[in-house]
Every structure is written in structure tokens, then in C-alpha cells.
Amino acid sequence: MATCLFLLGLFLLLPRPVPAPCYTATRSECKQKHKFVPGVWMAGEGMDVTTLRRSGSFPVNTQRFLRPDRTCTLCKNSLMRDATQRLPVAITHWRPHSSHCQRNVAAAKVHSTEGVAREAAANINNDWRVGLDVNPRPEANMRASVAGSHSKVANFAAEKTYQDQYNFNSDTVECRMYSFRLVQKPPLHLDFKKALRALPRNFNSSTEHAYHRLISSYGTHFITAVDLGGRISVLTALRTCQLTLNGLTADEVGDCLNVEAQVSIGAQASVSSEYKACEEKKKQHKMATSFHQTYRERHVEVLGGPLDSTHDLLFGNQATPEQFSTWTASLPSNPGLVDYSLEPLHTLLEEQNPKREALRQAISHYIMSRARWQNCSRPCRSGQHKSSHDSCQCECQDSKVTNQDCCPRQRGLAHLVVSNFRAEHLWGDYTTATDAYLKVFFGGQEFRTGVVWNNNNPRWTDKMDFENVLLSTGGPLRVQVWDADYGWDDDLLGSCDRSPHSGFHEVTCELNHGRVKFSYHAKCLPHLTGGTCLEYAPQGLLGDPPGNRSGAVW
């Protein structure tokens, strides 16, 4: 008896079972005009895996909700006050999530266009390649990117990379509201059936256009399982070398962007220690505005809610905790596609249908023709070398002048070379011709030529490499002409001072007796320009704008 009472007590302590949200409804219930569960059309919709864009066409019929016996499945939506809603026969395992939204901004650092595409494709939960011939076998020193390679965010990153040297900072907020998936053999949409019937029996060069027309309408894959809710994704492009010249790093700016995003959605107070640290950094670097206003080259995507897809809820002018709350409150009735699983379109055909294999080949061919290739054999610029960690990346030796990203550490730096020295009509001795030599000074360095004996019109073949100097503050470029005697009593015949500027210059200086001529070449370091190399100069990748394998590469 005591044992029974003990077991009864344990049973009463157990949590009450949560009722299943969906049930089989009677015919009379099914006749009532209930709405479908939110976002139900996204499962079964087509998608192009190279662009990650939904096609807007539906190979699967997600509108049918009545079974042959006229019953249906109805669900209680706890996120919409237990509203009763229909579930199509093509959908199963529908569940609302109780966690709603967490006010947290996830941050990530990305260093290449390929990395941006990879991040975009990370929302695919399964292996989309299964059953397709899409595993690139690139030639030596080539790297392929397929999924997401033509997505909007990857195109944004590619265009930036061809303008300048960039790092990318990603800030993301996600909310998950619902999840569901297609049944094992979902009913096909009538229009898709018609499109399949119109396809030629085989895929070859003469039928390629017909198959690609279907792919352009429906995509390469269809969505089989979804997590719906909302996502705000902001990718900020940061000019790597401009940051270095401003005394900042991409990590420092990225961290402060994340702090400002946290404040904008109410996840962090503006009195937090992190926020105060970023405010102090702004003062140190004399920034007049916020980090997100200073660094505003960005790509924004907002999924879910009634707002426009480019409305920036993290860094926009109206980005406030109240605006974020309004957006999250709209997600139960207007969810977006957060995560998903994909299957190739050809798997919807019966295995014995010969067009199944033809469509598989067509999809594989289309995807591979869209692959973007990174040319890792592309030569590095002068002074750079291939990274030991990544053969596709170039880097520099860390030094006082440049960092490992090959960025100059300060403005005004140039490589200075002085050469082509000659003099005319010198007069250094009374009884013989001049025994002339030169001294050349700049930035605390001194070079000296050899003596040209007994010649009033001497030439020197010396090439004086001052290497990397501060052009604007190194002082004048000074060339002195001397007449050699015994060393202690050498005579200074004249001096020539010039303030060097970038470019190639020929100089003629008049002396008391005769003249001296020379030339100098001052080449601004990469990412610097202007007369004294004080201005910033964007410097992108070598070659043409991004394209596919038949054109340019990343």
C-alpha cells in the first residue's frame, strides 16, 4: 500500500503532458473557413541553390487540405491566441515554438567573398548535393564555391572586394516561431505536372534550353522542411587598410558594431561597460558619429514581418527597442524562412520515369555552370607572398612599415629612390679639374658617391635606395656637391634642397659654379596616394569584376 501511495505521489509530481497542437477534425469542422497555418506555402516552394532565392513557383501542392474521406487536420496555434488553423495534407510535424525571440545579436567575422557565400548557405540544414553531380574537381590552385555563390550578399561582397581590400562583419538576430516539413510523397502541383510533361525525354545540348527554362521557373531544389520566424542579417564591409591608417582593427570595429546593435534592440543598456568602452574609443579616434554611421557600407536582409526587406532594424535611423518589439510581435502572423532543408527537384519524379535522370543531369549541369572559382594561382603584388595557411590569400611580412595585411601603418609612406646624378661646369680647383663627389640626405639617412677625379662634368651611376620613408615629414631631399682634397679640408661646392613628391621627377639645381642634375622616384605605398602620400587609395583585386568559371573569378 505504501508503495502504491509513493508511486501515486511521484505521478502527481510529473509535469502534465502537453497536448498535441494538431488533430484530425470532423467533416463539419473542416467545412468552416479556417485560415492555413502561417507560412505554410514555403515548404514545397522551389529554390535556386546558387542564389538561395525562393522561386515563387510551387512544384508541391500545399493548398489541398481535405483528405479523400473529407476529413482534415486542424491545429491550435498557441502563438496566435490558440487560433484554429488548417494544415495542408502535404505538411506534417507542425509545431509552434515557445521560445519566441531572444534579444541577442550574434556576431561573426568573415575575410573573403567565398566565406560570405559559405555563411549564407549555412542556413541549409541538410546536404543539398545528394544525388547530384556537383562536387567540383578544380584544376590545381583553383577553389570552387557553389551554394550561395550568386546570392545577393555574396554579390555584394564580391563587388566590394573588387573595389578595395575588405573584411566583413556579420551581425544577426534570429527568432524561431514554427517548424514543419513535407510528407514523404507530397502531392504535386498541377502546373508542375504540366511542365514535366512538356519536357523532352532526354537532356542534351539540343534540349538544354527546355530543361533550363523549367529550372529558371522552379529552381534547382524544393524546400522539404522549414524553421519559420524572423531574421535580421547585416553584413558590414570594412576597408581593412583604411582602418589600419585610422589606428583601428576590423575586430575592434566589429565588436563595437555588435554593441551598438545590442543597444538598438534593447539587449544591452547604453550604460553598459561595453558601450562605454566603445564611446571612449570614439573619443580617442575623434569620431563624430557612431560606429555604424561611420562604417556604413552594408548589406541588410530582414526576413519575416510586414517591413520592407531592406529596412535596417539594427543600424537604421529608426532602429530602437520599440521598433524591434513591433517587428517580433508581427512574426507569428508573418513569419519568414529562417532555416530549411532542400531536395533536388528531380526526386519528385517516379524512379522509373526517364525524365527523372534527365532532370537530374540538367540540374547538375546548371549548378556547375554557375559555380564561381577562386584563382589561387593569381600572383601576389610586389612585396607580398602566399599565406602559409591559405594558398588563395596573399600576406606581407609584419614590419614597422606594413602589417601582415599589407596595409601601411601610417600615412605619408613612400619608397624613395634617387639616381641619374650628373654635374656640369664645376669649378673646384685652381690648377686642375674638379675631383667631385656627392652626399645625399633624407629622413636621417645619408648616402655618398665615389669621387670622379679631375672632371668638371662628372656623372655618377649610383642608385640610392632610401627604401620606405615618410615623404611629408622626412625633411628636404638634399644633394650636396663636394670637391675632394684630403678629407678634412674638402670643399662644399653647393647644395640643392627639394621637398619630394610622389612620382618620377627630374631636378636641376644651379650652384655657385655650374649645376647639378638628378632624378628621384617616390612611389606611395599601396593604399596611399597624393603628392605626399597622405590620402587613402582603394586597391581591389587584380583582374575583372567577379563572374563564373567561363569569365572572371573571385
UniProtKB/Swiss-Prot annotation:
The record marks 213, 343 as: Important for oligomerization. GO terms for biological process: defense response to tumor cell; defense response to virus; granzyme-mediated programmed cell death signaling pathway; immune response to tumor cell; immunological synapse formation; killing of cells of another organism; positive regulation of killing of cells of another organism; protein homooligomerization. Residues 395-513 form the C2 domain. Detected in cytotoxic T-lymphocytes and natural killer cells. N-glycosylated. The glycosylation sites are facing the interior of the pore. Ca(2+) 3 binds at residues 429, 435, 483-485. Keywords: Calcium, Cell membrane, Cytolysis, Disulfide bond, EGF-like domain, Endosome, Glycoprotein, Lysosome, Membrane, Metal-binding, Secreted, Signal, Transmembrane, Transmembrane beta strand. Coiled coil: none annotated. Changing residue 429 to N: Abolished binding of the weakest calcium-binding site, leading to impaired interaction with lipid membranes. One of its GO terms (molecular function) is identical protein binding. Its main location: other. Perforin consists of three domains: (1) the MACPF domain, which includes the central machinery of pore formation, (2) the EGF-like domain, which forms a 'shelf-like' assembly connecting the MACPF and C2 domains, and (3) the C2 domain, which mediates calcium-dependent binding to lipid membranes. Monomer, as soluble protein. Homooligomer; homooligomerizes to form a pore-forming ring. Belongs to the complement C6/C7/C8/C9 family. This is Perforin-1. The gene is Prf1.
